[in-house]
Structures are given as C-alpha cells and as structure tokens.
C-alpha cells in the first residue's frame, strides 16, 4: 500500500478490525519511510454475473430493473419494503453462489418467481402472467391450480 503522505511503497499494518457488521476490514497503517499513520478500509468486490438474454445478447445484472419488476408485481399488495429487499438480497446471494460469470436470464426469472411466490401469491400470478406471456384465462387457471397443488419451496 502506498503512503498517501510521502508515496513510499512500504507500510505496515498496526491494527485490523471488522466494521460495518463484518462487511469491511478497517486497517490502521503506518508508513515505514515517514512514520505517518493512516486508515484504510477493505471491502470484498462481489460481482454479480452477466445475464444472457433469450436472444443471446449479454448485459450486466441490473438490480434496479429487477427491483422495479418485483415492485410492479407487488403493487398495492401488503408486502413491506423490508421483505422485498430481503427477497432481492436472497436472489443476489444465490446468483453470486453460482460462481458463474454469466447466467441465463431465465434462471433469474425463475428465482424471482420463487421469491414472489413466498411473498405474495397474487404478485406471483401477476409476474408469471407477464413473464410466461399468458394468452388466455386457461393459462391463468392452470397456474393458479399449480399454485394450489404445489407448496412453495423455501
């Protein structure tokens, strides 16, 4: 680590501790050359995989787009912002856990449907109707019947 005061390359760590609920490491450093002390913070770079769309194009993961789609499905439903944010965090965590650099958008869509199903069945049906492009009432009935038959997976 370069000293911000004199630019020397050699610094030593005097103290390290976890901060921000264990999400960061705070390090107190001292420059070997000039003796000045300074603090650094380290955070893991947690990169989400790129998405492969159905047409084969690739695009970066867009958390805001995901949030907007879920909010649209949950509109006027009794689900708190905290529960929505927890569902988003769970989806992002699962995506990181794949260890893949790229993931098909279909995988993300299925994760969203699973999370919405746990949050609110009406929101799940709303999202499924758009995501799966329902064409008529029979497709709604089939999905509602499947919802009644199969318990939500945790």
From Swiss-Prot:
<feature type="domain" description="ATP-cone">
    <location>
        <begin position="49"/>
        <end position="139"/>
    </location>
</feature>
<dbReference type="InterPro" id="IPR005144">
    <property type="entry name" value="ATP-cone_dom"/>
</dbReference>
<keyword id="KW-0863">Zinc-finger</keyword>
<dbReference type="InterPro" id="IPR003796">
    <property type="entry name" value="RNR_NrdR-like"/>
</dbReference>
<keyword id="KW-0804">Transcription</keyword>
<comment type="similarity">
    <text>Belongs to the NrdR family.</text>
</comment>
<dbReference type="GO" id="GO:0008270">
    <property type="term" value="F:zinc ion binding"/>
</dbReference>
<keyword id="KW-0067">ATP-binding</keyword>
<dbReference type="Pfam" id="PF03477">
    <property type="entry name" value="ATP-cone"/>
</dbReference>
<keyword id="KW-0479">Metal-binding</keyword>
<keyword id="KW-0238">DNA-binding</keyword>
<dbReference type="GO" id="GO:0003677">
    <property type="term" value="F:DNA binding"/>
</dbReference>
<protein>
    <recommendedName>
        <fullName>Transcriptional repressor NrdR</fullName>
    </recommendedName>
</protein>
<keyword id="KW-0547">Nucleotide-binding</keyword>
<keyword id="KW-0805">Transcription regulation</keyword>
<dbReference type="GO" id="GO:0045892">
    <property type="term" value="P:negative regulation of DNA-templated transcription"/>
</dbReference>
<dbReference type="InterPro" id="IPR055173">
    <property type="entry name" value="NrdR-like_N"/>
</dbReference>
<dbReference type="GO" id="GO:0005524">
    <property type="term" value="F:ATP binding"/>
</dbReference>
<keyword id="KW-0678">Repressor</keyword>
<comment type="function">
    <text>Negatively regulates transcription of bacterial ribonucleotide reductase nrd genes and operons by binding to NrdR-boxes.</text>
</comment>
<feature type="zinc finger region">
    <location>
        <begin position="3"/>
        <end position="34"/>
    </location>
</feature>
<dbReference type="Pfam" id="PF22811">
    <property type="entry name" value="Zn_ribbon_NrdR"/>
</dbReference>
<keyword id="KW-0862">Zinc</keyword>
């Amino acid at each position: 680590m370069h000293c911000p005061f004199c630019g020397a390359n050699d610094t030593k760590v005097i103290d390290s501790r976890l901060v921000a609920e264990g999400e960061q490491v705070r390090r107190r450093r001292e420059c070997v050359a000039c003796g000045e002390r300074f603090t650094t913070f380290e955070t893991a770079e947690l990169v989400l995989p790129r998405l492969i769309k159905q047409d084969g194009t690739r695009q970066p993961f867009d958390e805001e787009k995901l949030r907007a789609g879920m909010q649209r499905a949950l509109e006027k439903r009794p689900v708190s912002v905290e529960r929505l944010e927890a569902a988003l965090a769970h989806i992002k965590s699962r995506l990181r856990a794949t260890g893949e650099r790229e993931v098909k958008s279909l995988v993300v869509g299925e994760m969203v449907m699973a999370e919405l199903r746990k949050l609110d069945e009406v929101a799940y049906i709303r999202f499924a109707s758009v995501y799966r492009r329902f064409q008529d009432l029979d497709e709604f009935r089939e999905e509602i019947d499947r919802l009644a038959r199969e318990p939500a997976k945790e």
